[in-house]
């Protein structure tokens, strides 16, 4: 098992669900967790879970994975605060279930922008930091939806496959 004590871990999409669980698990294992989510989304529950897991300080950051300026700012701020970034858990995801005949180009693009482009641009932004450090881990959250079609989830399934 990879030792997490003292490691700096950015978790995207951490306000709820799997991202929240990842952040709390990393915190329990001693990581310096940086839970992130879209601006305006409450991180209070995630902060509480991380503190219950044993960390004293939880540094959260607003981060819109569809905005490269937001990504660059988050990476720079975390690097400035902690001096390194050891782990990126790229978990942010969007699903907009609806019948196929109702999926507009805007719906399709919104899902792809978060699930594909966001994951790619996060990795692209953090990779130079990790390369300069000579170490780092990038973890992408996938889904069985990428392997098994689900009714009314065409864009999501395509983005996870």
Model-derived segments and spans:
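Active-site helix of classical SDR
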Residues: 123, 159
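Active-site loop immediately N-terminal to the catalytic Tyr-X3-Lys motif
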Residues: 101, 148-154
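Conserved glycine-rich cofactor-binding loop
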Residues: 8, 15-17
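Conserved glycine-rich Rossmann-like NAD(P)H-binding loop of the short-chain dehydrogenase/reductase
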Residues: 29-45
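Substrate-binding pocket helix/loop in short-chain dehydrogenase/reductase
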Residues: 99-100, 107-109
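The beta1-alpha1 cofactor-binding region of Rossmann-like NAD(H)/NADP(H)-dependent oxidoreductases
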Residues: 40-41, 62-73, 105
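Residue(s) in the substrate-gating loop at a strand-loop-helix junction
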Residues: 143
